[in-house]
Every structure is written in structure tokens, then in C-alpha cells.
């Protein structure tokens, strides 16, 4: 089978937005205009739109699919869904890993909002080129130039308008294209009757000329040839300007801004043109790097069909029709349905059963995938999010996504016996889809504990369990994932001797413990000289230490960032065995409590609260009362932003408290930042509670 679209004509994009900027409608309209069946103008008076939308409402395909494939102007556009809420930054990060470019959607009334900033910063970290779509131009208070200004003021983004709206709010009736110098007038609300004229409308010509001048000046910074022409007053052709805007956008230091109203079907086709004109194809971005498992060397995989097959699984979903779907992005090479590939992350062989591509209102089974494609596989057994897939001959592991450890846990119990069995299956499926969601059974109480990235994260998962798996469950009070560590060094001599007639037990170790660097985890070194502890017992010593650290020394929380050195010991020819050394090692850990200054650590959250100015004093006081540190404040438009570091244990119920303090006008976002030592008085309470 030959390729349908060349790599150069492929675009893998995400739609990024704040919760209410209109991301869903924008995505729906993109799919409507690129739909293979309903090309605009083929059907009468919008009948096509209505039936499509009804089917859409019944099945909800576009919004639930992790990646949808569409066509536009001879290009293939794969749209990867990105969530809009901050508890799901992991979802956002994982989609940013597999897309090449993005459309940032803003609300024309509010411009850049707090969540926009978080997502924007993540996209900058991953070096993702963006175009900006200022949506909801028909809304009361919509102001295009103000929105462009917020990009400069709040994100310090080098953003330039490449379009200008004609009218605003109810009067929004057209768009001026500053690049091609054309005017688009919309004569109906379906976006089907469009009148295109060359030049600018007379009453807006001055403003349009001025903005076009600013655009050329802005883009000339990235292109010397254009700069010379501009300074010498020569005519710059439309093609030259487009090429220069593309070059500047790909540098991730220049952002073209477009305008429209997805709901009223205005500006979406022009935005699709911009996606094709200015966003990168897989060939324009840096080739993916990975580690060759055989040689341990870093290697690069070129985006080409001739290169060996390599792909990254970026989302696992459970589909009611076909079961487990694994969405993956192909970086190099090709693979056929029915063939075997290797999951190099897990070292397992997987069969690529069927390959599906999701379209706006259908799913298509395809015989093979090519470099740059995004598709879903049916039939994978062991593959989870972040795993690398490659050809069986060429071992490579692409840099995997790193997922933060969950910071909040709750106990969950089924409401009835019937729910009991279903709950286990539901939790297993949800954990498979979301790497930051963990589920475990507490061995002492038999309770099921679920852990995640925040209260909202867990609420939504419990809600999905009810909706998708029909499991009713009661949820307990949230618990914080504390950790323990040591602040001092200690040399501990630990002997385990048991003699009760017949063969005894004998294990003796001397272990030096000291704090490791933050985040470095547990390190074990064997410094035994002269075989005083036989080599075959050393793994048992390490094992004993690790298990004991996992069970805590103060309050039963895992101990992190510790170095252990086995320096001396002794053994008995008859009575020594692995078990005895394991017990001796774990007894050594118990003694750390008094000898190595053991402390409890708690997760600290980076919190941003956005509030109207009059609540400033109240909120600052509240942050302090929650043991928080205010780390900065800034004015953002007419609101104030308070940035603070607050312990997670003090953040429960904050959403409700903030709502009542600010009459519902405050918003906040928080994400895990680091672990910090708990103050003595609180540590004593935690220990008391843990040890009952």
C-alpha cells in the first residue's frame, strides 16, 4: 500500500485552551469542515450540519477520541486531544510529547487566562510551535486587539495579528486577511455563504495597513532577505511573506494570531489554512532520539518510511466496541496490521492486530501505518502509556515520558456486593489508561486505596467509574502521601542470632547509613573486604534494607534518599543463611530512628490564586494560616495573582473555601513541586496518629 499523504503534507497538532475558551466547539467545527462526507456546500441549508451534530451527540466520538484524523487542502491533519484542566497537566504533557504544533484557543473577551499560562509554559518547554486562534468574537465584550495584547503582557509572547475582525459581538461579520490582503464577509451563520474580495474595506484600510506593516516588521527579524527588502521599500510578495511567517513560527519565537467564532462558523477554514501554512510537518521538527538497547548509545531516528520502525504509545483507552485501544505516534518506518512489533520498554513482543484511524464521524481500519502517522492499535496486551514500540530487529527505547508520583490518596469501598467485583475491574482499566493514578490494597485493613494528582483528579475518576462502569462507591477522607528520610549519618552494628536446638540462625552486618541527595532515591554499596560476609548473602542484605525502608522508621511511610554501605559483618558456616542476613539488615534500619535524625517529609504544592484586588488581604492571610509561603504577587489585567508554596495537607477543601471567600470570583491552580520537612509539632502528631 502506498502512502496517501507525504510526510511534508502531514500535520500533528493539538488544540490547547482554557476550560471555557471553546476548545470543543472549535474541534467539532474543524472536523465538520474537513469531514469526508459533508464538504461545505454539498448539502442544502445546513441539513448536513444538523444530522452530523445529532449523530455526534448520540455517540460523542470527536470529543472522546484521543486522536482524530482529518483532511484539508491535500494535507492530513491529525488532531490530538488535550484536556483543559490543571489536575490533568500530565495528560497535557503526554499529548505535547507526540504533537508537532498546536493551536492555542483564547476567549476574545478574557484573552489569556490562568490555565492558558500553564499550558503555554508546558508547550514552550517542549518547543512546540503555535498559532493562536482568538475565538468567541461574537461574545459580548469581545476585543481582538486586547486579546493580542494579553499575549504580550502575560506570556511575553512575540505575537502578531495576521487577521483583523470586521465588527465585534453581534456585529462580527467578517475577517480581513492581512497576509493575502483579502476580505472575507460572512453572509449567513453557517459559514457557507462567504463573499471574498481583494483589498481591505475602505473604513478599515488604515488600521489594516498599519497592522500589516507591524507584521512584516516583526517577521523580518527572523529573515534577513525580507528585512533588506522592507528597509529598501521594495514590494514583498505574498508567498515570500508566508514563507517568512512559517520560518518564524517554526523557531518557536513568533506566534501568528487569527480570529473567529467557532460557534458561528466564522474563521475556522482560515485557521485550518494557517495550520497547513505555518505549523510544522514531522520533517520540520527535530528527529526523535532514543537509546539503542544493544550498545547503550544514543541514536536518532529520522522521520522517514525507510528508517526502522519506532513509535510511542501515548494513550490507552477502553472502547465499548473494540476493547482496549492503544494510541501511538509513529516516528519512523512503517508497520503492517497483523505483524509483530517489540515493546522495548517492557521487553515484550506484541501483535499489532488491527490498526484503526479515527475520523470525524467514523473509524477506518487501515492496513499499515507510515512515519508521522497517528493511529490506534487493537490487540496489545502489555503496552501502557509512554512505552516505545519498535521493529524486532532494531532495539530502541525513545525517551519515555516521566510521570510524577501521586500525592493524594483516598480509601474507596463499593456500596454493594455486586459492585465489589466490578470495582476491581474498573480500577484496573482506569489505572491502565492513566499512569498517574494508582490503586492498591492496604494489607493491614484490607481497604482499597486509590491515589492521584489532586482532589479533582480522583473525583473525576470516581465519577467515570460510576458512568462508564456502573460502579457505585463510597470515598473516604483524603490522605497525604508523606515520606520519611534521615538527616544524619549512622554506623549500625546489627546481629541476628537464634539458637533453639538443631540448626540456628546467624547473620551479622555493619552498615553505614547517610542521607542521599534529594530525589536520588536509595543507593546501596558493598564495601566488604576479605569475604567477612560471603558474596551470596549480599543481595539478601540489600533486600532486607530496601524492604525495611519501604515500611518506614517513624510512622510507616516509605523512606527516601538514603545511602547504605555494607562495610563489615561476620557469618557462621552452619547457621548462616540468606534469611538470617535479611533479618539482620532490616533490624539495622529500625535503629535509624534514634541514631540518624529521622524526619517526615510532606508534599509541597505550587499554588497560584487569581482573585479580584479587594480580596487580596484576606487570601494572603489565608495562605499564611495554611502554613504557606507567599512567593510573589503580580497584577494581571484587573486581577491579582498570588503565588505561594503550601503543604498539600492544608489544601483539602480549598476550592470551597476560596469560592466562599471571593463570592465565586477566585480561581486557583496547584501542582506538586517538591517534598519538604514537616515542622516538629506536626511531625509528632503524624507519628502519634500512625502508631495509634
From Swiss-Prot:
Name a single GO cellular component: cytoplasm
Q: Report a single Gene Ontology molecular function.
A: translation elongation factor activity
State the source organism's domain of life.
Answer: Bacteria
Please list the disulfide bridges: none
Principal cellular location given in the protein's record: cytoplasm
Gene3D superfamilies, alphabetically?
3.30.230.10, 3.30.70.240, Elongation Factor G (Translational Gtpase), domain 3, P-loop containing nucleotide triphosphate hydrolases, Translation factors
Query: Which positions in this protein are listed as binding GTP?
Result: 17-24, 81-85, 135-138
Which family is this sequence assigned to?
Belongs to the TRAFAC class translation factor GTPase superfamily. Classic translation factor GTPase family. EF-G/EF-2 subfamily.
Its recorded name reads Elongation factor G
Amino acid at each position: 500500500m502506498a502512502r496517501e499523504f507525504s510526510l511534508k503534507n502531514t500535520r500533528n497538532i493539538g488544540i490547547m485552551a482554557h476550560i471555557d475558551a471553546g476548545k470543543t466547539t472549535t474541534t467539532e467545527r474543524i472536523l465538520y469542515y474537513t469531514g469526508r462526507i459533508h464538504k461545505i456546500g454539498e448539502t442544502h441549508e445546513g441539513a448536513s450540519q444538523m444530522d452530523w451534530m445529532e449523530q455526534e451527540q448520540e455517540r460523542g466520538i470527536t470529543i472522546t477520541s484521543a486522536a482524530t484524523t482529518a483532511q484539508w487542502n491535500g494535507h492530513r491533519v491529525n488532531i490530538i486531544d488535550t484536556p483543559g484542566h490543571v489536575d490533568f497537566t500530565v495528560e497535557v504533557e503526554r499529548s505535547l510529547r507526540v504533537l508537532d504544533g498546536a493551536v492555542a484557543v483564547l476567549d476574545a473577551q478574557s484573552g489569556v487566562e490562568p490555565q492558558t499560562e500553564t499550558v503555554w509554559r508546558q508547550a514552550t518547554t517542549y518547543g512546540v510551535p503555535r498559532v493562536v486562534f482568538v475565538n468567541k468574537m461574537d461574545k459580548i465584550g469581545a476585543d481582538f486587539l486586547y486579546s493580542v495584547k494579553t499575549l504580550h503582557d502575560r506570556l511575553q509572547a512575540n505575537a502578531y495579528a495576521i487577521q483583523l475582525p470586521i465588527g465585534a459581538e453581534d456585529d462580527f461579520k467578517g475577517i480581513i486577511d492581512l497576509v493575502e490582503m483579502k476580505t472575507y464577509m460572512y453572509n449567513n451563520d453557517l459559514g457557507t455563504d462567504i463573499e471574498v474580495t481583494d483589498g481591505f474595506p475602505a473604513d478599515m484600510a488604515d488600521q489594516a495597513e498599519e497592522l500589516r506593516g507591524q507584521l512584516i516588521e516583526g517577521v523580518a527579524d527572523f529573515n534577513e532577505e525580507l528585512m533588506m527588502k522592507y528597509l529598501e521599500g521594495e514590494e514583498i510578495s505574498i508567498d515570500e511573506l508566508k514563507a517568512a511567517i512559517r520560518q518564524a513560527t517554526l523557531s518557536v519565537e513568533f506566534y501568528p494570531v487569527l480570529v473567529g467564532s467557532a460557534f458561528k462558523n466564522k474563521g475556522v477554514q482560515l485557521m485550518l489554512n494557517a495550520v497547513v501554512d505555518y505549523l510544522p510537518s514531522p520533517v520540520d521538527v527535530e528527529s526523535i532520539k532514543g537509546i539503542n538497547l544493544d550498545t547503550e548509545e544514543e541514536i536518532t531516528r529520522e522521520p522517514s518510511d525507510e528508517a526502522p520502525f519506532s513509535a510511542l504509545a501515548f494513550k490507552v483507552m477502553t472502547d465499548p466496541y473494540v476493547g482496549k485501544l492503544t494510541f501511538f505516534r509513529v516516528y519512523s518506518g512503517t508497520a503492517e496490521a497483523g505483524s509483530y512489533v517489540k515493546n522495548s520498554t517492557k521487553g515484550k513482543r506484541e501483535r499489532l492486530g488491527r490498526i484503526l484511524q479515527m475520523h470525524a464521524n467514523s473509524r477506518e481500519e487501515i492496513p499499515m501505518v507510515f512515519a508521522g502517522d497517528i493511529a490506534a492499535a487493537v490487540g496489545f496486551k502489555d503496552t501502557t502509556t509512554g512505552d516505545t514500540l519498535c521493529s524486532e530487529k532494531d532495539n530502541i527505547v525513545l525517551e519515555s515520558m516521566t510521570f510524577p508520583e501521586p500525592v493524594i490518596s483516598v480509601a474507596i469501598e463499593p456500596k454493594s456486593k455486586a459492585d465489589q467485583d466490578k470495582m476491581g475491574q474498573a480500577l484496573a482499566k482506569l489505572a491502565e489508561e492513566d499512569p498517574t493514578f494508582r490503586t492498591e490494597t492496604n494489607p493491614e485493613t484490607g481497604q482499597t486505596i486509590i491515589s492521584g494528582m489532586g482532589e479533582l483528579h480522583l473525583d473525576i475518576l470516581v465519577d467515570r467509574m460510576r458512568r462508564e462502569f456502573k460502579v457505585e462507591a463510597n470515598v473516604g477522607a483524603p490522605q497525604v502521601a508523606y515520606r520519611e528520610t534521615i538527616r544524619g549519618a549512622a554506623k549500625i552494628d546489627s546481629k541476628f542470632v537464634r539458637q533453639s536446638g538443631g540448626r540456628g540462625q546467624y547473620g551479622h552486618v555493619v552498615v553505614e547509613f547517610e542521607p542521599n541527595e534529594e530525589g536520588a532515591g536509595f543507593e546501596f554499596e558493598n564495601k566488604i573486604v576479605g569475604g567477612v560476609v560471603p558474596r551470596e548473602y549480599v543481595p539478601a542484605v540489600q533486600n532486607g534494607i530496601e524492604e525495611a525502608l519501604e515500611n518506614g522508621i517513624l510512622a510507616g511511610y516509605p523512606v527516601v534518599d538514603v545511602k547504605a554501605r555494607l562495610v563489615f559483618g561476620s557469618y557462621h558456616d552452619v547457621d548462616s543463611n540468606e534469611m538470617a542476613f535479611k533479618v539482620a539488615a532490616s533490624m539495622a534500619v529500625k535503629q535509624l530512628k534514634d541514631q540518624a535524625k529521622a524526619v517526615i517529609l510532606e508534599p509541597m504544592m505550587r499554588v497560584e490564586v487569581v482573585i479580584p484586588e479587594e480580596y487580596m488581604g484576606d487570601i494572603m492571610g489565608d495562605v499564611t494560616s495554611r502554613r504557606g509561603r507567599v512567593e510573589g504577587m503580580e497584577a494581571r489585567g484587573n486581577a491579582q495573582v498570588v503565588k505561594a508554596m503550601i503543604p498539600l495537607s492544608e489544601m483539602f477543601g480549598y476550592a470551597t473555601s476560596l469560592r466562599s471567600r471571593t463570592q465565586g470570583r477566585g480561581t486557583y491552580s496547584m501542582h506538586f513541586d517538591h517534598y519538604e520537612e514537616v515542622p516538629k509539632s506536626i511531625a509528632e502528631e503524624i507519628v502519634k496518629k500512625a502508631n495509634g
